């Protein structure tokens, strides 16, 4: 089927354990994944916007 496995049984046997491992790793999102570029569309906040937001929250605090 084009995925490198010659028989359907070996492909089905390989999907069980790897699928379970894949699900657990998708839950942990790294900083790199947050800033990933999908087909020319930027996903995530640029560092300038993050710095702006953090500096604004600091000035809002009153004693």
From Swiss-Prot:
Region ranges (Disordered): 1-39
Pfam family name, one: OCC1
InterPro entries assigned to the protein according to its UniProt record, in alphabetical order: OCC1
Disulfide bridge map: none
Stretches with biased composition (Polar residues): 1-10
Family: Belongs to the OCC1 family.
This protein's name: Overexpressed in colon carcinoma 1 protein homolog
Natural source organism: Mus musculus
Classification lineage: Eukaryota, Metazoa, Chordata, Craniata, Vertebrata
């Amino acid at each position: 089927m084009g995925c490198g496995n010659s028989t359907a049984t070996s492909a089905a046997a390989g999907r069980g354990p790897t699928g379970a491992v894949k699900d657990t790793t998708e839950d942990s999102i790294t900083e790199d994944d947050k800033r990933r570029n999908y087909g020319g569309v930027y996903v995530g906040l640029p560092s300038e916007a993050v710095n702006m937001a953090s500096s604004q929250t600091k000035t809002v605090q009153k004693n």
